[in-house]
Amino acid sequence: MGAYVRYVHSLVDQHEQQQLPDRAAMILMLHCQLLGWDQSLQLEEQADCPAESEFDRKVRLYTQVISLYDKASWWERAIALVGELKDQHEKNKCDFLQVAEYLEMQASFYRKVRTACDTLLAS
């Protein structure tokens, strides 16, 4: 699996260099899909990832994907992914400060969707 993850990250880097954040995000999600939400499972350093818990790695990768979705103006996808992070922090970590930050992030993306819709309707 290590070679696969390294390949995924090299593709992500290539697509980011080509300014294709939508494709980079889709590719990075392939790594995310390999991970669960286990806080006790410690993962070794791999590709661009330091040694960390499976939970922390998935959060970090999701955060990268959300940033790429934002660059690609895929705010609906970002909203869904932020919602999953919010749910995990609410149910599994009881980190309500982080939950509040995720809700603010979702609100920001909803405002971007609204602004884009208003712009389209005004055209």
Locate predicted features.
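Nucleo/cytoplasmic regulatory scaffolds in medium-to-very-large eukaryotic proteins
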Residues: 1-123
